[in-house]
Amino acid sequence: MIMPKKERKVEGEEVIRVPLPEGNQLFGVVEQALGAGWMDVRCEDGKIRRCRIPGKLRRRVWIRVGDLVIVQPWPVQSDKRGDIVYRYTQTQVDWLLRKGKITQEFLTGGSLLVE
């Protein structure tokens, strides 16, 4: 009796959906690390928000200046404060650029997003 060969998964080829901002969430680029889990983030609406990194994200992800993130503005002081919800990897940023969700100018500090 001949048995079929097992299919082997090639490492690094795992398909993961790229999360996009939902509801009132925004794209943002980290401008400055302030310490104690706080960062200044330039958001897609042109405002600079002081955002905190929630504990569950702080323990798992290292966020640096220049990283593309998703920001959830707070219900109170929504144009000044927010939470960082997700950090994109470089591969995910490249995919967002190819699909036209963000522009290179937004990442480098120029104009805002493509709608």
Curated annotation (Swiss-Prot):
Residue stretches making up the S1-like domain: 14-89
Cited CDD domains: S1_IF1A
Coiled coil (residue ranges): none
GO MF, one example: translation initiation factor activity
PROSITE patterns attached to this UniProt entry: IF1A, S1_IF1_TYPE
Domain of life: Archaea
Alphabetical UniProt keywords: Initiation factor, Protein biosynthesis
PANTHER family linked to this entry: EIF-1A
Task of the protein: Seems to be required for maximal rate of protein biosynthesis. Enhances ribosome dissociation into subunits and stabilizes the binding of the initiator Met-tRNA(I) to 40 S ribosomal subunits.
Family the UniProt entry places it in: Belongs to the eIF-1A family.
HAMAP family in the cross-refs: aIF_1A (MF_00216)
Record's protein name: Translation initiation factor 1A
Highest classification ranks of the organism: Archaea, Methanobacteriati, Methanobacteriota, Thermococci, Thermococcales
